Amino acid sequence: GHIFFSDNWFGFDDGIYGAARFADIFSGQEKPLSALPGWPKTAKTPEIHMPCPDEIKFEVVKRAQAYFRNKYTVSEIDGVRVIRPDGWGLIRASNTQPALILRFEAETENAMNELRKDMEAPLKGWIAELGGKS
């Protein structure tokens, strides 16, 4: 992941500056860092590479944007990100290989698997329809 601070800095991600800012923020706290609540527990996939020929991958993403826009709240920055109350899924065209890149995260394993199934099924159909292998 990345973290950006736009105040008191140039507004790009910088790991060393991020660590220094966190140290500065927490140095003013009376409680130790161990008193902070833990990270939320979620189910998530690693980055999934779905084979998709270069010639059709951007058309597949375009179809995904139109399709999922009618079903869910979506963000179309760099692909399509489906946003649900219990999780999210991302589809984007790889810039370096003939593949679509997918990621899924949800509050539970079942919710993540449901979203993944819902998003992968039409992708496979569009890839086959446009001349790729599914």
PLM segments and residue spans:
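Phosphate-binding and adjacent anionic-ligand microenvironments
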Residues: 1-103, 108-134
